[in-house]
Amino acid sequence: MPACYCATSTSLENNELLYKNIRNLFSTSRSFPIEQEWMNLKSISQMKDFFSNFPGNSKANNHFLCNSPLKFEIFNNEKSVKPSNGPHLFTRCSCRCNKLLSGDYITQQQPIDASAEHSLNAKGINTYSLKNCFQRSGFIGSYEESLFSGHMPYCSSVPFEFSIEIGVISFCRCKPSLVFPPHLKINFVAYSLVGNVDNVQFPYIGRFRLRSQKSDKVMNKGYPFGYRIPSVGQLQLILRQTNGLVIKVFLVPYNVSSMVDCSKTWIRQKHYLQQLDDKSGKILSHLKFGLQLQIICTSAGHHYLYDSQRIIFVQQSLGGLYGNTKIVNETLLSESCR
């Protein structure tokens, strides 16, 4: 589970032992700070300047944080500290601290271990979505835009497994194989958000990548860029739980015949639940389902669903609604194809 740690309150325990183990790994490094400078560090927040002056900290790594509860276990455990990987560990530590210690809070998400990743791959689950579908950061534009981009100032829950089935039907003249091509089924994982916000139910955020489904026979033989679609038609995406229960069926009509060769675009569909507030008389809209699909037009004029697709959904039925409530569907196409 993700956790938050305050950078100004985390203290450095066993400072002397920590310095000794790290210093032994950098016996050939002349730029390593002297012991007196290290001992003056009283908290994690003071390590920002210390790491910023250390060479080789241009890139950040999401899988290691020096201020996590495992920091002393990593550096104090002689079995885990080896001369071969010590400089690499310390560089990752310094890079991440230099980037994140400027803020008030730091987030540490547990990386997927090898056994868990192997288990997910054996089930056919796209581990790309598990590692990249969510990033904790500030809002980007509106709340909806932040959901679609995956940047939210809240922690994520444990991953949940889902599956999605993609199909398309053609509304234009095309090859017979594109009139109703075989469906493509993809397993993926989705997160829910965890935040201290009253009366707010966060939806699930999932991401699946078409190009990485190399084990699928359809992808190997017929769709090198992703899932090929006709220029005009209607996409059907069926979202299911692992037990086969259907959560939502997305029907996305589209027309990308105006796309030029070697261009990209996206389609976004949003489903709102609108309610009339009895007190204020205003109409309140709540995003319940969302879908963002990326489309590419190759140099040969073929259209594909490609790369990563994002989906937003809730696991509650919208049926049985009554009173001043209605469901509104909205489909958007990027300006390049309008």
Curated annotation (Swiss-Prot):
GO terms for cellular component: cytoplasm; cytosol; nucleus. This is Uncharacterized protein C3H8.04. It holds the Pfam family Chromosome_seg. It comes from Schizosaccharomyces pombe (strain 972 / ATCC 24843). Signal peptide: none annotated. The lineage of its organism: Eukaryota, Fungi, Dikarya, Ascomycota, Taphrinomycotina. It comes from the Eukaryota.
